[in-house]
Protein backbone atom coordinates (compact mmCIF):
# COMPACT_ATOMS: atom_id res chain seq x y z
CA UNK A 1 0.00 0.00 0.00
CA UNK A 2 2.88 2.36 0.72
CA UNK A 3 4.23 2.11 -2.80
CA UNK A 4 0.80 2.65 -4.33
CA UNK A 5 0.13 5.66 -2.15
CA UNK A 6 3.53 7.15 -2.90
CA UNK A 7 3.12 6.64 -6.64
CA UNK A 8 -0.32 8.21 -6.50
CA UNK A 9 1.06 11.20 -4.64
CA UNK A 10 3.90 11.52 -7.14
CA UNK A 11 1.56 11.36 -10.13
CA UNK A 12 -0.45 14.23 -8.73
CA UNK A 13 2.51 16.36 -9.72
CA UNK A 14 1.79 15.75 -13.41
CA UNK A 15 -0.74 18.57 -13.23
CA UNK A 16 0.10 22.13 -12.44
CA UNK A 17 -0.30 24.04 -9.26
CA UNK A 18 -2.80 26.85 -9.65
CA UNK A 19 -0.16 29.36 -8.69
CA UNK A 20 3.53 29.80 -9.36
CA UNK A 21 6.18 31.70 -7.46
CA UNK A 22 7.39 35.14 -8.34
CA UNK A 23 10.60 36.01 -10.09
CA UNK A 24 11.74 37.77 -6.95
CA UNK A 25 12.07 35.35 -4.04
CA UNK A 26 10.39 32.38 -5.72
CA UNK A 27 11.85 30.88 -8.90
CA UNK A 28 9.39 30.46 -11.78
CA UNK A 29 9.27 27.08 -13.49
CA UNK A 30 9.88 27.72 -17.19
CA UNK A 31 8.16 24.45 -18.18
CA UNK A 32 4.75 25.54 -16.90
CA UNK A 33 2.21 25.40 -19.70
CA UNK A 34 -0.62 27.35 -18.10
CA UNK A 35 -0.97 31.05 -17.46
CA UNK A 36 -0.70 31.09 -13.67
CA UNK A 37 -1.27 33.91 -11.18
CA UNK A 38 1.99 34.99 -9.59
CA UNK A 39 2.52 35.49 -5.85
CA UNK A 40 4.62 38.65 -5.79
CA UNK A 41 7.34 39.49 -3.30
CA UNK A 42 6.37 42.72 -1.54
CA UNK A 43 8.66 44.95 0.49
CA UNK A 44 8.50 48.32 2.20
CA UNK A 45 6.36 49.63 5.05
CA UNK A 46 2.91 49.82 3.40
CA UNK A 47 1.15 46.65 2.24
CA UNK A 48 -2.24 45.97 0.67
CA UNK A 49 -3.44 42.39 0.99
CA UNK A 50 -6.72 40.97 -0.32
CA UNK A 51 -8.10 37.62 0.78
CA UNK A 52 -10.37 36.05 -1.82
CA UNK A 53 -11.03 32.91 -3.84
CA UNK A 54 -8.89 31.74 -6.75
CA UNK A 55 -9.32 28.71 -9.03
CA UNK A 56 -6.36 26.33 -8.77
CA UNK A 57 -5.52 23.00 -10.38
CA UNK A 58 -2.98 21.08 -8.33
CA UNK A 59 -4.12 17.47 -8.83
CA UNK A 60 -5.83 17.50 -12.23
CA UNK A 61 -9.14 18.78 -10.89
CA UNK A 62 -9.95 22.46 -10.56
CA UNK A 63 -10.76 23.63 -7.06
CA UNK A 64 -11.38 26.96 -5.36
CA UNK A 65 -8.60 27.97 -3.02
CA UNK A 66 -8.67 30.83 -0.56
CA UNK A 67 -5.70 33.01 -1.39
CA UNK A 68 -3.92 36.24 -0.52
CA UNK A 69 -3.51 38.56 -3.53
CA UNK A 70 -4.43 35.62 -5.77
CA UNK A 71 -1.39 33.51 -4.92
CA UNK A 72 -0.84 30.17 -3.22
CA UNK A 73 1.21 30.77 -1.14
CA UNK A 74 0.49 34.46 -0.68
CA UNK A 75 3.13 37.09 -1.37
CA UNK A 76 6.45 37.01 0.46
CA UNK A 77 6.41 40.02 2.78
CA UNK A 78 9.83 41.63 3.29
CA UNK A 79 10.20 43.96 6.25
CA UNK A 80 13.13 45.70 7.96
CA UNK A 81 13.89 45.42 11.64
CA UNK A 82 13.02 48.69 13.37
CA UNK A 83 10.47 49.86 10.79
CA UNK A 84 6.84 50.52 11.60
CA UNK A 85 4.71 48.74 9.03
CA UNK A 86 1.08 49.05 8.00
CA UNK A 87 -0.86 46.20 6.40
CA UNK A 88 -4.35 46.80 5.04
CA UNK A 89 -6.18 43.47 4.76
CA UNK A 90 -9.33 43.43 2.61
CA UNK A 91 -11.79 40.53 2.91
CA UNK A 92 -13.33 39.45 -0.43
CA UNK A 93 -14.64 36.16 0.95
CA UNK A 94 -18.24 35.53 1.92
CA UNK A 95 -17.12 34.61 5.44
CA UNK A 96 -15.07 36.16 8.22
CA UNK A 97 -11.29 36.03 7.90
CA UNK A 98 -8.10 37.13 9.64
CA UNK A 99 -4.30 37.10 9.41
CA UNK A 100 -1.98 36.10 12.25
CA UNK A 101 1.71 37.05 12.04
CA UNK A 102 3.31 33.86 13.34
CA UNK A 103 6.20 34.41 15.75
CA UNK A 104 6.04 38.19 15.50
CA UNK A 105 6.24 40.20 18.73
CA UNK A 106 3.51 42.85 18.58
CA UNK A 107 0.55 44.34 20.51
CA UNK A 108 -2.30 41.96 21.29
CA UNK A 109 -4.82 43.81 19.09
CA UNK A 110 -2.52 43.28 16.08
CA UNK A 111 -2.10 39.51 16.58
CA UNK A 112 -5.03 38.52 14.37
CA UNK A 113 -6.98 35.93 16.38
CA UNK A 114 -10.77 36.44 16.18
CA UNK A 115 -12.41 36.41 19.59
CA UNK A 116 -9.18 37.22 21.41
CA UNK A 117 -7.19 39.87 19.53
CA UNK A 118 -10.06 41.43 17.64
CA UNK A 119 -13.46 40.58 16.18
CA UNK A 120 -12.18 39.33 12.84
CA UNK A 121 -12.56 40.83 9.38
CA UNK A 122 -16.10 40.58 8.05
CA UNK A 123 -16.89 40.22 4.31
CA UNK A 124 -16.06 43.39 2.35
CA UNK A 125 -14.43 44.95 5.41
CA UNK A 126 -10.81 46.03 5.77
CA UNK A 127 -8.67 45.76 8.89
CA UNK A 128 -5.49 47.79 9.29
CA UNK A 129 -2.63 46.14 11.14
CA UNK A 130 0.19 48.45 12.22
CA UNK A 131 3.13 47.68 14.51
CA UNK A 132 6.86 48.19 14.93
CA UNK A 133 9.10 45.34 13.80
CA UNK A 134 11.25 44.36 16.78
CA UNK A 135 13.08 41.33 15.39
CA UNK A 136 14.63 39.83 12.28
CA UNK A 137 14.67 36.46 10.58
CA UNK A 138 12.35 34.01 8.82
CA UNK A 139 8.68 33.85 9.82
CA UNK A 140 5.27 33.37 8.21
CA UNK A 141 1.66 34.49 8.31
CA UNK A 142 -1.66 32.67 8.00
CA UNK A 143 -5.37 32.89 8.63
CA UNK A 144 -6.57 32.16 12.15
CA UNK A 145 -10.21 31.76 11.07
CA UNK A 146 -11.79 28.31 10.79
CA UNK A 147 -9.88 26.04 8.40
CA UNK A 148 -8.81 28.74 5.93
CA UNK A 149 -5.12 28.02 6.48
CA UNK A 150 -5.67 24.57 4.93
CA UNK A 151 -7.36 26.23 1.97
CA UNK A 152 -4.40 28.46 1.09
CA UNK A 153 -4.35 31.56 3.32
CA UNK A 154 -0.66 31.65 4.24
CA UNK A 155 2.64 33.17 3.13
CA UNK A 156 6.25 33.85 4.12
CA UNK A 157 7.78 36.77 6.02
CA UNK A 158 11.43 37.82 5.74
CA UNK A 159 12.70 40.48 8.15
CA UNK A 160 16.07 41.98 7.23
CA UNK A 161 18.37 42.56 10.20
CA UNK A 162 19.36 46.04 11.32
CA UNK A 163 22.85 44.83 12.31
CA UNK A 164 25.18 42.61 10.26
CA UNK A 165 24.27 38.94 10.52
CA UNK A 166 26.77 36.47 12.05
CA UNK A 167 27.12 34.46 8.83
CA UNK A 168 27.70 35.23 5.15
CA UNK A 169 25.84 34.08 2.05
CA UNK A 170 25.59 35.09 -1.61
CA UNK A 171 21.99 34.25 -2.46
CA UNK A 172 18.81 33.15 -0.71
CA UNK A 173 15.65 31.22 -1.45
CA UNK A 174 12.48 30.80 0.56
CA UNK A 175 11.36 27.16 0.69
CA UNK A 176 7.80 27.08 1.98
CA UNK A 177 6.31 23.64 2.53
CA UNK A 178 2.59 22.98 2.76
CA UNK A 179 -0.09 20.33 2.31
CA UNK A 180 -3.02 20.62 -0.09
CA UNK A 181 -6.22 18.59 -0.31
CA UNK A 182 -8.94 18.77 -2.96
CA UNK A 183 -11.43 17.87 -0.24
CA UNK A 184 -13.42 20.45 1.64
CA UNK A 185 -11.51 20.73 4.95
CA UNK A 186 -14.76 20.61 6.93
CA UNK A 187 -15.66 17.32 5.20
CA UNK A 188 -12.18 16.02 5.97
CA UNK A 189 -12.65 16.89 9.65
CA UNK A 190 -16.02 15.12 9.74
CA UNK A 191 -14.33 11.97 8.42
CA UNK A 192 -11.72 12.15 11.16
CA UNK A 193 -14.44 12.53 13.77
CA UNK A 194 -16.23 9.45 12.46
CA UNK A 195 -13.05 7.40 12.00
CA UNK A 196 -9.82 8.93 13.26
CA UNK A 197 -7.64 6.60 11.15
CA UNK A 198 -9.65 7.20 7.97
CA UNK A 199 -6.52 8.34 6.08
CA UNK A 200 -4.18 5.68 7.49
CA UNK A 201 -3.64 3.08 4.77
CA UNK A 202 -0.52 1.62 6.40
CA UNK A 203 -2.13 -0.49 9.11
CA UNK A 204 -0.41 -3.72 10.23
CA UNK A 205 -1.18 -6.71 8.02
CA UNK A 206 -0.89 -10.48 8.23
CA UNK A 207 2.37 -10.18 6.32
CA UNK A 208 3.80 -7.68 8.79
CA UNK A 209 2.71 -9.95 11.65
CA UNK A 210 4.82 -12.81 10.32
CA UNK A 211 7.75 -10.46 9.68
CA UNK A 212 7.53 -9.33 13.32
CA UNK A 213 7.40 -12.95 14.48
CA UNK A 214 10.63 -13.64 12.58
CA UNK A 215 12.43 -10.68 14.16
CA UNK A 216 10.87 -10.47 17.63
CA UNK A 217 9.41 -13.90 18.34
CA UNK A 218 5.82 -15.11 18.56
CA UNK A 219 5.10 -14.23 22.20
CA UNK A 220 6.44 -10.67 21.96
CA UNK A 221 4.58 -10.04 18.71
CA UNK A 222 1.26 -11.32 20.06
CA UNK A 223 1.65 -9.28 23.26
CA UNK A 224 2.43 -6.15 21.25
CA UNK A 225 -0.56 -6.58 18.92
CA UNK A 226 -2.81 -7.30 21.91
CA UNK A 227 -1.78 -4.09 23.65
CA UNK A 228 -2.39 -1.94 20.58
CA UNK A 229 -5.76 -3.60 20.01
CA UNK A 230 -6.88 -3.05 23.60
CA UNK A 231 -5.90 0.61 23.40
CA UNK A 232 -7.81 1.03 20.13
CA UNK A 233 -4.67 2.57 18.64
CA UNK A 234 -2.40 1.82 15.73
CA UNK A 235 1.43 1.97 15.69
CA UNK A 236 1.39 3.29 12.11
CA UNK A 237 -0.90 6.24 12.89
CA UNK A 238 1.81 8.91 12.85
CA UNK A 239 -0.21 11.55 11.02
CA UNK A 240 -3.96 12.00 11.14
CA UNK A 241 -4.03 13.10 7.50
CA UNK A 242 -1.79 11.40 4.94
CA UNK A 243 -0.71 11.40 1.32
CA UNK A 244 -3.94 9.57 0.55
CA UNK A 245 -5.61 12.99 0.32
CA UNK A 246 -2.67 15.39 0.60
CA UNK A 247 -0.42 16.65 -2.15
CA UNK A 248 2.75 18.04 -0.60
CA UNK A 249 3.83 21.37 -2.03
CA UNK A 250 7.07 23.31 -2.20
CA UNK A 251 6.42 27.01 -2.79
CA UNK A 252 2.97 26.08 -4.07
CA UNK A 253 4.17 23.49 -6.59
CA UNK A 254 3.54 19.75 -6.63
CA UNK A 255 6.52 17.36 -6.87
CA UNK A 256 6.69 16.94 -10.66
CA UNK A 257 6.46 20.68 -11.22
CA UNK A 258 9.95 20.77 -9.71
CA UNK A 259 10.22 24.20 -8.11
CA UNK A 260 13.72 25.40 -8.92
CA UNK A 261 16.05 27.72 -7.02
CA UNK A 262 18.98 28.96 -9.07
CA UNK A 263 22.61 29.33 -7.97
CA UNK A 264 26.12 29.68 -9.33
CA UNK A 265 28.64 26.99 -8.34
CA UNK A 266 30.67 28.05 -5.34
CA UNK A 267 28.04 30.39 -3.95
CA UNK A 268 26.81 30.12 -0.39
CA UNK A 269 23.04 29.77 -0.53
CA UNK A 270 20.74 30.60 2.36
CA UNK A 271 17.60 28.47 2.33
CA UNK A 272 14.77 29.76 4.51
CA UNK A 273 12.63 26.70 5.27
CA UNK A 274 9.09 27.31 6.53
CA UNK A 275 6.61 24.58 7.40
CA UNK A 276 3.29 26.20 6.54
CA UNK A 277 1.38 22.91 6.56
CA UNK A 278 -1.90 22.32 8.28
CA UNK A 279 -0.92 18.88 9.60
CA UNK A 280 2.35 17.58 8.10
CA UNK A 281 5.80 17.19 9.63
CA UNK A 282 8.57 16.99 7.03
CA UNK A 283 12.01 15.37 7.12
CA UNK A 284 14.28 17.41 4.87
CA UNK A 285 17.56 16.56 3.18
CA UNK A 286 19.47 17.56 0.05
CA UNK A 287 21.39 14.48 -1.15
CA UNK A 288 24.97 15.42 -1.91
CA UNK A 289 24.95 18.55 0.26
CA UNK A 290 25.58 19.23 3.92
CA UNK A 291 23.32 21.83 5.50
CA UNK A 292 24.57 24.22 8.17
CA UNK A 293 21.71 25.33 10.41
CA UNK A 294 22.18 28.99 11.38
CA UNK A 295 18.73 30.01 12.65
CA UNK A 296 15.67 28.37 14.20
CA UNK A 297 12.30 30.13 14.35
CA UNK A 298 13.98 33.32 13.14
CA UNK A 299 16.59 33.37 15.94
CA UNK A 300 20.32 32.89 15.40
CA UNK A 301 21.80 29.62 16.67
CA UNK A 302 25.37 28.38 16.85
CA UNK A 303 26.06 26.77 13.46
CA UNK A 304 25.52 23.02 13.32
CA UNK A 305 26.10 20.96 10.18
CA UNK A 306 23.70 18.12 9.41
CA UNK A 307 22.51 15.86 6.61
CA UNK A 308 18.85 16.04 7.57
CA UNK A 309 16.39 17.76 9.88
CA UNK A 310 12.78 17.37 10.91
CA UNK A 311 10.65 20.50 10.74
CA UNK A 312 7.49 20.57 12.83
CA UNK A 313 4.39 22.34 11.63
CA UNK A 314 4.88 26.14 12.03
CA UNK A 315 8.64 25.96 12.65
CA UNK A 316 11.24 27.70 10.47
CA UNK A 317 14.90 26.83 9.92
CA UNK A 318 17.56 28.76 8.01
CA UNK A 319 20.41 26.71 6.54
CA UNK A 320 23.49 27.49 4.45
CA UNK A 321 24.55 25.17 1.62
CA UNK A 322 27.49 25.39 -0.81
CA UNK A 323 26.59 23.53 -4.02
CA UNK A 324 29.38 22.81 -6.50
CA UNK A 325 27.56 20.68 -9.08
CA UNK A 326 24.70 21.51 -11.44
CA UNK A 327 21.59 20.17 -9.70
CA UNK A 328 20.53 18.94 -6.25
CA UNK A 329 17.15 17.66 -5.07
CA UNK A 330 15.52 19.30 -2.06
CA UNK A 331 13.65 16.31 -0.64
CA UNK A 332 11.02 16.79 2.07
CA UNK A 333 9.27 13.52 2.93
CA UNK A 334 6.29 13.42 5.24
CA UNK A 335 6.93 11.92 8.67
CA UNK A 336 4.54 9.05 7.95
CA UNK A 337 6.28 8.34 4.62
CA UNK A 338 3.14 8.63 2.48
CA UNK A 339 4.51 11.28 0.15
CA UNK A 340 6.91 14.16 -0.29
CA UNK A 341 7.47 17.67 -1.52
CA UNK A 342 10.36 18.16 -3.88
CA UNK A 343 12.29 20.90 -5.65
CA UNK A 344 15.71 21.47 -7.17
CA UNK A 345 18.69 23.71 -6.63
CA UNK A 346 20.16 24.15 -10.10
CA UNK A 347 22.49 26.28 -12.19
CA UNK A 348 19.74 26.81 -14.77
CA UNK A 349 16.05 26.13 -15.31
CA UNK A 350 15.07 22.68 -16.54
CA UNK A 351 17.68 20.69 -14.64
CA UNK A 352 16.82 18.03 -12.09
CA UNK A 353 18.62 15.52 -9.90
CA UNK A 354 17.68 12.04 -8.74
CA UNK A 355 14.77 11.89 -6.30
CA UNK A 356 15.49 9.43 -3.47
CA UNK A 357 12.92 6.80 -2.51
CA UNK A 358 10.84 7.31 0.60
CA UNK A 359 12.40 5.91 3.75
CA UNK A 360 10.80 2.82 5.33
CA UNK A 361 7.58 3.44 7.20
CA UNK A 362 8.32 3.91 10.93
CA UNK A 363 6.30 2.28 13.70
CA UNK A 364 5.53 3.69 17.13
CA UNK A 365 6.56 1.66 20.16
CA UNK A 366 5.36 1.68 23.75
CA UNK A 367 8.67 3.31 24.69
CA UNK A 368 7.99 6.11 22.19
CA UNK A 369 4.76 6.89 24.03
CA UNK A 370 6.27 6.91 27.51
CA UNK A 371 5.02 3.41 28.28
CA UNK A 372 8.33 1.58 28.46
CA UNK A 373 8.21 -1.48 30.71
CA UNK A 374 4.47 -1.15 31.35
CA UNK A 375 3.17 -3.33 28.58
CA UNK A 376 2.05 -6.34 30.63
CA UNK A 377 0.36 -4.14 33.24
CA UNK A 378 -1.63 -2.34 30.55
CA UNK A 379 -2.61 -5.56 28.86
CA UNK A 380 -4.39 -6.71 32.00
CA UNK A 381 -6.19 -3.51 32.92
CA UNK A 382 -9.96 -3.00 32.80
CA UNK A 383 -10.98 -1.11 29.65
CA UNK A 384 -14.71 -1.30 30.22
CA UNK A 385 -15.31 1.91 32.15
CA UNK A 386 -15.93 4.19 29.21
CA UNK A 387 -17.98 2.03 26.91
CA UNK A 388 -21.22 3.94 27.29
CA UNK A 389 -19.92 7.45 26.92
CA UNK A 390 -21.10 10.01 24.41
CA UNK A 391 -19.01 10.18 21.25
CA UNK A 392 -20.00 13.70 20.21
CA UNK A 393 -17.01 15.31 21.91
CA UNK A 394 -18.94 18.59 22.40
CA UNK A 395 -16.01 20.50 20.90
CA UNK A 396 -16.08 24.10 19.82
CA UNK A 397 -14.48 25.45 16.69
CA UNK A 398 -12.02 28.27 17.22
CA UNK A 399 -14.27 30.83 15.58
CA UNK A 400 -16.87 30.18 18.26
CA UNK A 401 -19.38 28.14 16.23
CA UNK A 402 -20.53 24.68 17.31
CA UNK A 403 -19.27 21.99 14.99
CA UNK A 404 -21.98 19.83 13.43
CA UNK A 405 -22.47 16.42 14.98
CA UNK A 406 -20.21 14.07 13.08
CA UNK A 407 -22.29 11.05 13.97
CA UNK A 408 -20.84 7.68 14.81
CA UNK A 409 -19.04 5.09 12.75
CA UNK A 410 -20.94 2.27 11.13
CA UNK A 411 -19.54 -0.31 13.56
CA UNK A 412 -20.04 -0.07 17.34
CA UNK A 413 -16.84 0.87 19.11
CA UNK A 414 -15.45 -0.01 22.54
CA UNK A 415 -14.27 3.29 23.99
CA UNK A 416 -11.48 1.71 25.98
CA UNK A 417 -9.05 4.02 27.69
CA UNK A 418 -5.96 3.95 29.78
CA UNK A 419 -7.30 7.04 31.54
CA UNK A 420 -9.71 4.78 33.43
CA UNK A 421 -6.99 2.75 35.13
CA UNK A 422 -5.91 3.32 38.72
CA UNK A 423 -2.74 5.43 38.72
CA UNK A 424 -2.75 6.12 42.46
CA UNK A 425 -0.01 3.60 43.20
CA UNK A 426 2.07 4.61 40.19
CA UNK A 427 2.12 8.31 41.11
CA UNK A 428 4.42 7.61 44.02
CA UNK A 429 6.75 5.29 42.17
CA UNK A 430 10.21 6.59 41.20
CA UNK A 431 10.24 7.95 37.66
CA UNK A 432 6.48 7.69 37.24
CA UNK A 433 4.68 10.76 35.93
CA UNK A 434 1.74 12.13 37.90
CA UNK A 435 -1.37 13.47 36.18
CA UNK A 436 -4.02 16.07 36.97
CA UNK A 437 -7.31 14.91 38.41
CA UNK A 438 -9.09 16.29 35.34
CA UNK A 439 -7.66 13.40 33.28
CA UNK A 440 -9.12 10.65 35.51
CA UNK A 441 -12.16 8.83 34.11
CA UNK A 442 -12.29 11.46 31.40
CA UNK A 443 -14.05 10.57 28.13
CA UNK A 444 -11.69 12.90 26.26
CA UNK A 445 -8.51 11.14 27.45
CA UNK A 446 -7.52 7.70 26.18
CA UNK A 447 -3.96 7.37 27.50
CA UNK A 448 -1.49 8.74 30.02
CA UNK A 449 2.26 8.60 29.59
CA UNK A 450 3.90 7.22 32.73
CA UNK A 451 7.63 7.38 31.96
CA UNK A 452 8.53 10.66 30.26
CA UNK A 453 11.72 12.65 29.62
CA UNK A 454 12.78 15.61 27.43
CA UNK A 455 14.39 13.40 24.74
CA UNK A 456 16.13 16.48 23.37
CA UNK A 457 18.85 14.40 21.72
CA UNK A 458 16.37 12.10 19.96
CA UNK A 459 16.01 12.88 16.23
CA UNK A 460 12.55 11.32 16.30
CA UNK A 461 10.71 8.28 15.06
CA UNK A 462 11.87 7.21 11.61
CA UNK A 463 15.14 9.16 11.84
CA UNK A 464 17.11 7.16 14.40
CA UNK A 465 20.21 5.30 13.20
CA UNK A 466 19.49 5.99 9.54
CA UNK A 467 23.14 6.54 8.64
CA UNK A 468 22.71 10.31 8.34
CA UNK A 469 23.53 13.11 10.76
CA UNK A 470 20.09 14.33 11.85
CA UNK A 471 19.45 17.56 13.73
CA UNK A 472 18.03 17.28 17.25
CA UNK A 473 16.79 19.94 19.65
CA UNK A 474 19.93 19.24 21.74
CA UNK A 475 21.99 20.62 18.82
CA UNK A 476 20.22 23.99 18.96
CA UNK A 477 21.98 26.63 21.05
CA UNK A 478 21.11 30.31 20.78
CA UNK A 479 24.01 32.62 20.01
CA UNK A 480 23.04 34.67 23.06
CA UNK A 481 22.54 34.04 26.76
CA UNK A 482 19.12 33.90 28.39
CA UNK A 483 17.70 37.31 27.37
CA UNK A 484 15.82 37.67 30.66
CA UNK A 485 18.39 36.32 33.09
CA UNK A 486 15.96 35.60 35.91
CA UNK A 487 15.11 32.15 37.15
CA UNK A 488 11.43 31.26 36.70
CA UNK A 489 9.32 32.25 39.69
CA UNK A 490 6.83 29.42 39.20
CA UNK A 491 6.00 26.49 36.93
CA UNK A 492 2.78 25.79 35.04
CA UNK A 493 2.44 22.13 34.05
CA UNK A 494 0.11 21.26 31.20
CA UNK A 495 -0.64 17.84 29.75
CA UNK A 496 -1.34 17.38 26.05
CA UNK A 497 -4.33 15.06 25.99
CA UNK A 498 -6.54 13.39 23.46
CA UNK A 499 -8.82 10.55 22.50
CA UNK A 500 -7.73 9.07 19.19
CA UNK A 501 -10.95 7.20 18.48
CA UNK A 502 -13.10 10.29 19.07
CA UNK A 503 -10.57 12.66 17.51
CA UNK A 504 -10.83 14.86 20.60
CA UNK A 505 -7.88 17.03 21.68
CA UNK A 506 -7.29 19.17 24.75
CA UNK A 507 -4.97 20.39 27.50
CA UNK A 508 -5.35 18.47 30.80
CA UNK A 509 -8.40 16.73 29.35
CA UNK A 510 -10.40 19.98 29.35
CA UNK A 511 -11.80 21.12 26.03
CA UNK A 512 -11.33 24.76 25.05
CA UNK A 513 -14.96 25.76 25.60
CA UNK A 514 -14.75 24.61 29.25
CA UNK A 515 -11.24 25.81 30.07
CA UNK A 516 -10.45 28.86 32.19
CA UNK A 517 -7.77 31.22 30.85
CA UNK A 518 -4.17 30.68 31.88
CA UNK A 519 -3.40 33.79 33.94
CA UNK A 520 0.06 35.38 33.86
CA UNK A 521 1.19 38.41 35.83
CA UNK A 522 2.70 41.14 33.68
CA UNK A 523 6.48 41.09 33.92
CA UNK A 524 6.86 37.70 35.58
CA UNK A 525 9.30 35.04 34.43
CA UNK A 526 7.77 31.56 34.59
CA UNK A 527 8.32 28.04 33.35
CA UNK A 528 5.82 26.07 31.28
CA UNK A 529 6.24 22.30 31.33
CA UNK A 530 4.44 20.25 28.68
CA UNK A 531 3.83 16.51 29.04
CA UNK A 532 2.55 14.60 26.03
CA UNK A 533 -0.10 12.08 27.09
CA UNK A 534 -0.95 11.12 23.50
CA UNK A 535 0.59 9.00 20.75
CA UNK A 536 0.79 11.99 18.41
CA UNK A 537 3.46 14.67 18.06
CA UNK A 538 2.25 18.20 18.82
CA UNK A 539 3.84 21.56 17.85
CA UNK A 540 2.81 24.00 20.59
CA UNK A 541 2.71 27.74 19.88
CA UNK A 542 2.32 30.60 22.36
CA UNK A 543 1.34 33.87 20.72
CA UNK A 544 2.90 37.20 21.64
CA UNK A 545 5.85 35.95 23.72
CA UNK A 546 9.00 33.92 23.17
CA UNK A 547 9.39 30.34 24.35
CA UNK A 548 12.92 29.82 25.73
CA UNK A 549 13.52 26.07 25.67
CA UNK A 550 15.46 24.57 28.59
CA UNK A 551 17.84 21.63 28.57
CA UNK A 552 17.47 18.58 30.84
CA UNK A 553 19.05 20.50 33.73
CA UNK A 554 16.79 23.52 33.48
CA UNK A 555 19.29 25.77 31.71
CA UNK A 556 18.38 28.12 28.87
CA UNK A 557 19.14 26.47 25.55
CA UNK A 558 17.39 28.06 22.57
CA UNK A 559 14.73 30.70 21.88
CA UNK A 560 11.78 29.56 19.76
CA UNK A 561 8.17 30.45 18.97
CA UNK A 562 6.99 26.85 18.44
CA UNK A 563 7.97 23.90 20.64
CA UNK A 564 7.74 20.38 19.22
CA UNK A 565 6.51 17.86 21.81
CA UNK A 566 6.78 14.22 20.61
CA UNK A 567 4.98 11.34 22.35
CA UNK A 568 6.43 10.33 25.70
CA UNK A 569 8.24 13.63 26.24
CA UNK A 570 8.26 16.24 28.98
CA UNK A 571 9.69 19.54 27.78
CA UNK A 572 10.06 22.82 29.65
CA UNK A 573 10.58 26.37 28.51
CA UNK A 574 10.73 29.81 30.07
CA UNK A 575 8.37 32.64 29.24
CA UNK A 576 8.61 36.32 30.12
CA UNK A 577 5.08 37.71 30.38
CA UNK A 578 5.96 41.07 28.86
CA UNK A 579 2.91 41.46 26.60
CA UNK A 580 -0.38 42.61 28.12
CA UNK A 581 -3.59 41.21 26.70
CA UNK A 582 -5.34 38.04 25.59
CA UNK A 583 -3.22 35.56 23.65
CA UNK A 584 -3.81 32.25 21.89
CA UNK A 585 -1.93 29.15 23.03
CA UNK A 586 -2.48 25.98 21.02
CA UNK A 587 -1.33 22.96 19.12
CA UNK A 588 -0.44 24.06 15.58
CA UNK A 589 -1.85 20.93 13.98
CA UNK A 590 -4.87 22.69 12.52
CA UNK A 591 -7.46 19.98 13.17
CA UNK A 592 -6.17 19.39 16.72
CA UNK A 593 -6.55 23.10 17.46
CA UNK A 594 -10.00 23.10 15.92
CA UNK A 595 -11.05 20.15 18.07
CA UNK A 596 -10.01 21.63 21.40
CA UNK A 597 -6.22 21.74 21.99
CA UNK A 598 -6.38 25.48 22.54
CA UNK A 599 -6.20 27.78 25.57
CA UNK A 600 -6.40 31.50 26.17
CA UNK A 601 -3.39 33.00 27.95
CA UNK A 602 -4.21 36.28 29.66
CA UNK A 603 -1.42 38.64 30.77
CA UNK A 604 -2.64 41.14 33.36
CA UNK A 605 -1.07 43.72 35.67
Swiss-Prot record:
GO terms for cellular component: periplasmic space. Residues 1-41 form the signal peptide. Cu cation 4 binds at residues 538, 587, 592, 597. Keywords: Copper, Metal-binding, Oxidoreductase, Periplasm, Plasmid, Repeat, Signal. GO terms for molecular function: copper ion binding; oxidoreductase activity. Cu cation 3 binds at residues 144, 543, 586. The gene is pcoA. Disulfide bonds: none annotated. Sequence repeats lie at residues 382-389, 414-421, 422-429. Cu cation 1 binds at residues 100, 541. It is found in: Periplasm. Required for the copper-inducible expression of copper resistance. May have oxidase activity. It comes from the Bacteria. This is Copper resistance protein A. Belongs to the multicopper oxidase family. CopA subfamily. Residues 382-429 are annotated as: 3 X 8 AA tandem repeats of D-H-X-X-M-X-G-M. The lineage of its organism: Bacteria, Pseudomonadati, Pseudomonadota, Gammaproteobacteria, Enterobacterales. Predicted to be exported by the Tat system. The position of the signal peptide cleavage has not been experimentally proven. The keyword Signal applies. It comes from Escherichia coli. Cu cation 2 binds at residues 102, 142, 588.
Amino acid sequence: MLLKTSRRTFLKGLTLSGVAGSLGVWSFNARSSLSLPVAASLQGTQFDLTIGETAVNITGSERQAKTINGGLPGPVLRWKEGDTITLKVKNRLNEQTSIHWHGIILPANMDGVPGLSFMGIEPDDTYVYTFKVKQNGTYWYHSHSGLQEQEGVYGAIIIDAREPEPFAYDREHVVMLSDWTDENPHSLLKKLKKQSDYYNFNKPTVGSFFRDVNTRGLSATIADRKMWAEMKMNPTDLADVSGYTYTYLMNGQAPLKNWTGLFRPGEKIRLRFINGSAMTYFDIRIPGLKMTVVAADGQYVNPVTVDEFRIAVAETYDVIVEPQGEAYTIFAQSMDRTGYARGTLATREGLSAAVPPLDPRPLLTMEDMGMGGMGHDMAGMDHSQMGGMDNSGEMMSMDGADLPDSGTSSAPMDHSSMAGMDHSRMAGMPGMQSHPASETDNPLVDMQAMSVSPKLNDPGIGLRNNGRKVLTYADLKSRFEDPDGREPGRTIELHLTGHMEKFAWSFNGIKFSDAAPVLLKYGERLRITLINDTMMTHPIHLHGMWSDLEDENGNFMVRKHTIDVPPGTKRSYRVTADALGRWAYHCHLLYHMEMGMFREVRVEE
